[in-house]
UniProtKB/Swiss-Prot annotation:
Keyword DNA repair part of the UniProt annotation: no
Annotated residues for binding of ATP: 185-186, 267, 289, 298
Keywords, alphabetical: ATP-binding, Cytoplasm, Disulfide bond, Nucleotide-binding, Redox-active center, RNA-binding, Thiamine biosynthesis, Transferase, tRNA-binding
Cellular component aspect of the GO annotation: cytosol
EC number: 2.8.1.4
Annotated organism of origin: Ectopseudomonas mendocina (strain ymp)
Gene: thiI
PROSITE patterns in alphabetical order: RHODANESE_3 (PS50206), THUMP (PS51165)
The name this protein goes by in its record: tRNA sulfurtransferase
């Protein structure tokens, strides 16, 4: 398979050195994203377009390559092509006919040609000649340049002809690694996951910072969704997941801060801690998922007071977004189901939260707060590469594993729905249910407690983690299914 990758249009208007730098970075990212599928992958070109070639012919692997490229920042679109020596107009027609003859009978079509280089014909000459012959020789219904049912596409570069047989839209944005880095404050809900996606889509490498308010299940859920976002949109770069234990901070706020000021002060403590983390990692900006007036702490007045806790730039990509638009984006990128099933821990709930915080009042309340507690939280923070976070979590978890499922037991396939659909799990003589890992904790209590359940995933890590959590919650009827 050969692909022609067209870069994000904004890259093409950069100065020559910057343009070359961005396109070179995109080439590196494409190699990194596809290397595990094809170590022999070839990526060439440094100016207008990149050419990607693979000798693989497995349809599943090729489909996975296509999906990964669609989600790689920096790509405007890419084309699946077949390359031929140019030849004359009749030769061009024959190559197009080979690929499009089966699609044209009874159809209205148009021919589109893009051309670069010196030739004895123009792009319009090619379109007219090829269109006329295909209409006559392929039993097409006619030609319509405005609303064709089929488009015959080709590109000509010097003495090379590329017949296009598939076109895929890319993510746009700049290549990850070509711009600065950010630290995203992650709660795992709709807003923070979409905010992270927006920054990555634009081309900013985004690390993840989670403030654990006291729920182990919540921490696990946020790790899972952060790993998902990175794997789908940012896998070309190494990023970190930082978890800061904030239970003591919450306790101090509950014990010493006026109820109406709790939410604003908690956000200020998070910004202080995130700033320290970012400075240590030499990251230049923080990112949150806040939108104007979505909740009481997000009025303009409150946001200004919250931001005064740090000198670092705080970016809010969703600031003017409607909630439904955010949910729609989360659905599109695959994080909505994570958010819907995310365990929550609300330790700071104001009965009458202020919508107009005043700086002097906040300073007075914070004077009661023991800042040594915030320092302890930062000292106890954990930091892991995002690609190892799930493995590290499961490393010391001990759960009974079984190699064989028996009649009467139920195997629960907890893989992501895409993986379960691509390769359905079949265990002869045993019932198999599909329940994605992100919904497992909420849905498990609805299952028959008199049955025994075996959790299954590809590597056994996610199933061990969730089995361990369910056992700690008092569900004794859980094991891990690891077929030989």
């Amino acid at each position: 398979m050969k692909l022609i990758v067209k870069v994000f249009p904004e890259i093409t208007i950069k100065s020559r050195p910057v343009r070359k730098q961005f396109i070179r970075q995109l080439g590196k990212n494409i190699r990194a994203v596809l290397r595990d599928l094809d170590p022999e992958l070839r990526v060439t070109g440094v100016w207008d377009n990149l050419e990607v070639e693979t000798d693989l012919d497995d349809p599943k692997l090729l489909a996975e390559m296509t999906e990964r490229l669609r989600n790689t920042p920096g790509i405007g679109l890419f084309l699946e092509v077949n390359e031929y020596p140019l030849g004359d107009l009749d030769a061009i027609t024959e190559h197009c006919k080979r690929h499009y003859a089966d699609q044209l009978p009874g159809k209205i079509f148009a021919v589109r040609c893009k051309r670069g280089g010196k030739h004895p014909f123009s792009s319009i000459d090619v379109e007219r000649h090829v269109g006329s012959r295909l209409r006559q020789e392929c039993n097409a219904a006619g030609i319509d340049l405005k609303k064709p049912e089929v488009e015959v596409r080709m590109e000509i570069r010097d003495q090379r002809l590329f017949v296009v047989h598939n076109r895929h839209e890319g993510l746009g944005g700049y290549p990850l690694g070509s711009l600065e880095q950010t630290l995203v404050l992650m709660s795992g809900g709709f807003d923070s996951t979409v905010a992270a996606y927006q920054m990555m889509r634009r081309g900013l490498v985004s690390h993840f910072c989670f403030f654990n308010l006291g729920g182990r299940a919540h921490e696990l859920g946020v790790m899972e969704v952060a790993h998902y976002i990175w794997q789908k949109f940012g896998r070309s770069q190494r990023v970190l997941f930082i978890s800061v234990p904030f239970e003591e901070v919450v306790g101090e706020i509950l014990g010493k801060v006026d109820n109406s000021q709790m939410g604003v002060i908690l956000k200020r403590m998070m910004l202080r801690a995130a700033t320290r983390v970012a400075e240590r990692l030499e990251i230049e900006a923080l990112v949150t998922g806040e939108a104007i007036s979505q909740v009481s702490s997000q009025t303009l007045t409150n946001l200004a007071v919250i931001d005064s806790a740090t000198d670092m730039l705080v970016m809010r990509p969703l600031i003017a977004s409607h909630k439904q638009d955010i949910i729609d984006t989360a659905t599109q990128i695959g994080t909505a189901e994570f958010a819907k099933n995310m365990p929550e821990y609300c330790g700071v709930i104001s009965v009458n939260p202020t919508t107009k915080a005043r700086g002097y009042r906040i300073e007075r309340e914070e004077a009661q707060f023991d800042m040594a507690i915030l320092e302890r939280a930062l000292e106890r923070a954990t930091q892991l590469p995002i690609d190892r976070v799930i493995d590290e979590l499961g490393k010391d978890v001990q759960v009974e594993e079984v190699r064989e499922a028996l009649a009467g037991q139920i195997v629960i396939d907890i893989r992501h729905p895409d993986a379960a659909e691509d390769e359905p799990l079949d265990v002869p003589g045993v019932e198999v249910q599909t329940l994605p890992f992100y919904a497992l904790n909420n849905k498990f209590k609805e299952l028959d407690e008199n049955r025994q359940y075996l959790l299954y995933c590809d590597k056994g890590v996610m199933s061990r983690l969730h089995a361990h959590h369910l056992l700690s919650e008092g569900h004794a009827n859980v094991r891990v299914y690891r077929p030989a």
